[in-house]
Amino acid sequence: MRISTDGIRNRILKKIYVIVEIKGGFGNQLFQFAFANSLRKMGYKVKVKTNFYEQFENDNFENTYRKLVLPETLFGFKKTNKLTNRLLVWAHKFNKSKKIKKIFGKRNNSFFIKLKDSDYSLEKMNKKVIHLDGYWQNIDSIISNKKYLIESISKNLILKEGFDNC
């Protein structure tokens, strides 16, 4: 019996956890959810990280006020919990630590990688946990996810009215 390479690839991808950071305003959120959906369609297990918006819960923020306009539930995603968010921070610091590199030498961490949109490539998507942080402003991603985006944001009654009035 021969196993197809697609079957093997899908089994491998289902064991890779991808966390897409959601941040910015309405437009950036659309790009990020479209990108996350593209990864999900490829077979990755995808969650979103929305704790960026917690900094705006008190009045002493320095950046432009932003609000999570599009909750992850509209798009069928689950968000990371506080423990996962802390582990991501720790894993990133561990990977970047000069002391760790000095003690253990340069090593390739096969478990975790954090990629910015400028560093992203599918070839780097080979770790057990992948944290993707960026705006992912690629119009092709929006076009290929157009139906998904419209269906998702139409679950918000205010936004649905906007589509119905067009």
Please describe what each predicted stretch is.
Residues 27-29, 55-59:
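Short catalytic/ligand-binding loop motif for oxyanion handling, primarily in non-cytosolic enzymes
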Residues 45-55:
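A short beta-strand-loop structural module common to alpha/beta enzyme folds
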Residues 31-39:
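Short amphipathic alpha-helix
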Residues 1-13:
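N-terminal amphipathic/basic-hydrophobic helices that include classical n-h-c signal peptides
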Residues 21-31:
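A short, glycine/small-residue-rich beta-strand->loop->alpha-helix junction that serves as a flexible
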Residues 22, 50, 134:
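Pocket-edge structural micro-motifs
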